[in-house]
């Protein structure tokens, strides 16, 4: 069920055509052209990153968790994993991975899930669904609330129990760890730098992340 294929990237951050540090709790939306590479770097360690993707040719064809899991016969993602859309279309391939534990089942925290899982007073805490909604409200892309679907939680440690349930455990990432993926189609990336304080997925201390596109040659070729 679980196999970690650790691989370092051949690309250098100093060659990036784009980089941005995102503070804890914020959302981020960015277009990635086919052939470009995208890296998420965990600056301080143990930070969960709620992420989903959309096919820019058909934004309704968003990342599909079931299609991705079934095609690779594995619930976890690592080097070589193909992230697929609902149609089955390959959107991205993970080309480098330094943690090997990326959740495909836990989904994004929300006001409703915080209330059910933790306590009624938690309903007012900022959450990943809020971050997603704020990004969608500002985008000019044809992506709406209806297009939110189960997402990937990069760096998030969600073991499956013997009974078939799942739990949120301490993260396995560390400062400087990263995951890198190459776009197999033109995609829109939607991210929430998870603000969760009620479970150990962020070590109860949400922190900053670095997003880069360290692929100048591919970028130039796609323009």
What does each of the following model-derived ranges do?
Residues 2-75, 223:
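Solvent-exposed, flexible loop/coil segments flanking beta-strands in beta-rich domains
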Residues 34-40, 181-193:
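Noncatalytic modules at the cell exterior or secretory-pathway interfaces
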Residues 50-52, 88, 106, 185:
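Extracytoplasmic copper-binding redox domains, predominantly the cupredoxin/blue-copper superfamily
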Residues 69-154:
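Low-complexity, serine/threonine/proline-enriched polar segments
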């Amino acid at each position: 069920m679980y196999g970690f294929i650790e691989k370092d990237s051949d690309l250098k951050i100093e060659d990036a055509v784009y980089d941005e540090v995102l503070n804890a709790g914020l959302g981020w939306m960015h277009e990635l052209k086919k052939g470009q590479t995208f890296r998420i770097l965990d600056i301080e360690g143990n930070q969960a990153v709620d992420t989903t993707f959309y096919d820019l040719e058909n934004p309704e064809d968003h990342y599909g968790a079931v299609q991705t899991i079934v095609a690779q016969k594995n619930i976890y993602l690592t080097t070589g994993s193909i992230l697929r859309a609902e149609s089955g279309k390959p959107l991205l391939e993970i080309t480098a991975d330094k943690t090997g534990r990326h959740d495909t089942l836990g989904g994004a925290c929300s006001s409703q899930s915080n209330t059910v899982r933790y306590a009624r007073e938690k309903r007012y805490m900022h959450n990943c669904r809020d971050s997603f909604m704020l990004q969608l409200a500002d985008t000019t892309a044809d992506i709406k609330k209806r297009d939110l679907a189960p997402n990937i939680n990069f760096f998030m440690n969600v073991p499956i129990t013997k009974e078939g349930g799942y739990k949120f455990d301490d993260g396995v990432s560390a400062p400087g760890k990263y995951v890198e993926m190459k776009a197999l189609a033109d995609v829109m990336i939607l991210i929430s730098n998870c603000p969760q304080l009620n479970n150990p997925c962020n070590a109860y201390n949400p922190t900053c992340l670095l997003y880069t596109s360290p692929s100048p040659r591919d970028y130039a070729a796609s323009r």
